Amino acid sequence: MKEQLNQLSAYQPGLSPRALKEKYGIEGDLYKLASNENLYGPSPKVKEAISAHLDELYYYPETGSPTLKAAISKHLNVDQSRILFGAGLDEVILMISRAVLTPGDTIVTSEATFGQYYHNAIVESANVIQVPLKDGGFDLEGILKEVNEDTSLVWLCNPNNPTGTYFNHESLDSFLSQVPPHVPVIIDEAYFEFVTEEDYPDTLALQQKYDNAFLLRTFSKAYGLAGLRVGYVVASEHAIEKWNIIRPPFNVTRISEYAAVAALEDQQYLKEVTHKNSVERERFYQLPQSEYFLPSQTNFIFVKTKRVNELYEALLNVGCITRPFPTGVRITIGFKEQNDKMLEVLSNFKYE
């Protein structure tokens, strides 16, 4: 076994609603608001597509997901040779890390961000430099100070998970202009579709200026396909060619591909869902206590508090399962009825 595995632990999902009911003696419904899933679910066209292809389950998928690749290529106006799919972004991150990193290499990222950047670097015996957050978001200037000619990968998450904060187009453009051109910069935009701020980066446009800027997106969040696992990277043709060597032959299932194509085609449904999310998100920031809420461009809100366990349990007592962190609680934005319950708790909670 690799010795570095002793530094890590397997991913631990939160307790199920049933287990939480037993642990806390809760009666009534519990709502899972801990994993940033799209509670509205996928487009109805997704269910139609799945039903239409159920008789194909005994076939292996078409390797490389060519139908979905063509759809993404048209949607983003990028060449198909620049797209690679994974079974969720978890697998994409794993493939990139495995293809790029060798023992002793170094990655640079943020201290409080998606944990798989760190996890996969350690698996490959690489070193990890984690720069502290600044005002709850990525400190791009601080990260630049740690990047040099020998850096192997830079991971940025925009908007950031778990804080929900973002950096703008000008900041990313300036950052990329100062990174050595041979150092890959991976920009994880898993929550891109929820963004409403106009100065959010046009990363696809920046890729025309910077060959080392690579973009990650997923169908797990706004498109509502977390259970089917489809994510992808848009990168240079050369990078995709090499990373494709790492990709398992049939990693995205046949049903997942059909579902993702159907979801992508129904942009009207996506707009409706993301609009509902932005309306409900704004309700949280109307509270007088919103000074404790980091500004979010996602479908979740990070609530800062020194009394993490107390807030987690207070929300649990009104039927809402959230995600505790050392410095606060991450809340997935739910339906109006669920949000009403959480807003009542948040408006009466003592944060200090």
Swiss-Prot record:
Per its record, the protein catalyses:
L-histidinol phosphate + 2-oxoglutarate = 3-(imidazol-4-yl)-2-oxopropyl phosphate + L-glutamate
Q: Which UniProt keywords apply?
A: Amino-acid biosynthesis, Aminotransferase, Histidine biosynthesis, Pyridoxal phosphate, Transferase
Q: Positions modified as N6-(pyridoxal phosphate)lysine? A: K221
Question: InterPro entries from the entry?
Answer: Aminotrans_II_pyridoxalP_BS, Aminotransferase_I/II_large, HisP_aminotrans, HistidinolP_aminotransfase, PyrdxlP-dep_Trfase, PyrdxlP-dep_Trfase_major, PyrdxlP-dep_Trfase_small
Gene3D superfamilies reported in the protein's UniProt record? Aspartate Aminotransferase, domain 1, Type I PLP-dependent aspartate aminotransferase-like (Major domain)
**What cofactor is this protein dependent on?**
pyridoxal 5'-phosphate
**What's an example of a GO molecular-function annotation for this chain?**
histidinol-phosphate transaminase activity
Q: What is its EC number?
A: 2.6.1.9
- Listed as disulfide-bonded, the cysteine pairs are none
| SUPFAM superfamilies reported in the protein's UniProt record | PLP-dependent transferases (SSF53383)
Q: Pathway of this protein?
A: Amino-acid biosynthesis; L-histidine biosynthesis; L-histidine from 5-phospho-alpha-D-ribose 1-diphosphate: step 7/9
- One biological process term in Gene Ontology: L-histidine biosynthetic process
| Zinc in keyword set | no
Instruction: Extract the PROSITE patterns matched here.
Output: AA_TRANSFER_CLASS_2 (PS00599)
Q: Which family does it belong to?
A: Belongs to the class-II pyridoxal-phosphate-dependent aminotransferase family. Histidinol-phosphate aminotransferase subfamily.
PANTHER family referenced in this protein's UniProt entry, alphabetically:
HISTIDINOL-PHOSPHATE AMINOTRANSFERASE, HISTIDINOL-PHOSPHATE AMINOTRANSFERASE 2
Check the record and name the NCBIfam families matching this protein: hisC
Quote the subunit structure annotation. Answer: Homodimer.
Q: Which protein, by its recorded name, is this? A: Histidinol-phosphate aminotransferase
